Amino acid sequence: MEIQFLGTGAGQPAKARNVSSLVLKLLDEINEVWMFDCGEGTQRQILETTIKPRKVKKIFITHMHGDHVFGLPGFLSSRAFQANEEQTDLDIYGPVGIKSFVMTGLRTSGSRLPYRIHFHEFDESSLGKIMETDKFTVYAEKLDHTIFCMGYRVVQKDLEGTLDAEALKLAGVPFGPLFGKVKNGENVTLEDGREIIAKDYISEPKKGKVITILGDTRKTDASIRLALGADVLVHESTYGKGDERIAKSHGHSTNMQAADIAKQANAKRLLLNHVSARFMGRDCWQMEEDAKTIFSNTHLVRDLEEVGI
């Protein structure tokens, strides 16, 4: 499981940073890639990675500001340029209006897609658990921005314990159906009368990962709830230390506020993104260092950077 950042800038494309988009790679878990936001130029950024557009099965949009959605019609169209047998349906989750935005762009440009898009639109009254599969659950809450904006909490369900096959062999259990029974938690009796207790050969379930990905926001308690105990918190850092007033007026956060959210939520790791173009080079290093005074496990990410979870 990895996060790869396709765009880490704020507002408009800059030389060092494209606008907002990231992907959560779940290839080992479910052979899928989930995209969060799709600012303009996202498909160009993808060309610099190993990401296959057909693997992108779900797109989560945080809000309707252009730097988070203007790349969506182009990406969806480019995704169509694949062999027919590789076409897979796509789910798009986002605020009310995302369907109209996408379909208007596709219709007026004469674009035809060889796959279906399933839209899931939300307003403030329909948030909470927005998606569940056998391996993942996704929750959403309203953040505090200048327009309706959501943050997402992706929860991996606990992983089953693994079978200690070597220990079973040493215990004299023949490979075959008995292995399967033990793996399923059944006790078995061998021909010599010995009983094999399944739980002695299966490790404890492994806690699933929690990944919190926030859209643009002022400092808000909703961010804390979404990030509670998260393995990774991705939080915007449009402004730096001392910029709290201007951040609030524009519906954004500073690096220090993001760090405080991570600390209050007892998150394990904080990744800062959505950085204003006025911060470059050493300024970015300083933003990270300042945030570390509040939350030590902080990192300010760069475009195309990949982070393991």
UniProtKB/Swiss-Prot annotation:
| Cofactor remark from the record | Binds 2 Zn(2+) ions.
Q: Where are the transmembrane segments?
A: none
Do you know which CDD domains this protein is assigned to? Answer: RNaseZ_ZiPD-like_MBL-fold (cd07717)
Catalytic activity, reaction form: Endonucleolytic cleavage of RNA, removing extra 3' nucleotides from tRNA precursor, generating 3' termini of tRNAs. A 3'-hydroxy group is left at the tRNA terminus and a 5'-phosphoryl group is left at the trailer molecule
Q: What class of enzyme is it?
A: hydrolase
Q: Which of this chain's residues are annotated to bind Zn(2+) 1?
A: 63, 65, 145, 216
Q: Pfam families under this entry? A: Lactamase_B
Question: For Zn(2+) 2, which residues are the binding ones?
Answer: 67-68, 216, 274
Q: Name one GO molecular function term.
A: zinc ion binding
Q: Which family does it belong to?
A: Belongs to the RNase Z family.
Q: Give the function comment from the record.
A: Zinc phosphodiesterase, which displays some tRNA 3'-processing endonuclease activity. Probably involved in tRNA maturation, by removing a 3'-trailer from precursor tRNA.
Per its UniProt record, what NCBIfam families does this chain match?
Answer: PRK00055.1-3, RNase_Z
The subunit field of the Swiss-Prot or TrEMBL record says:
Homodimer.
Query: Any idea what this protein is called?
Result: Ribonuclease Z
What lineage does UniProt assign to this protein's organism?
A: Bacteria, Bacillati, Bacillota, Bacilli, Lactobacillales
Q: Which gene encodes it?
A: rnz
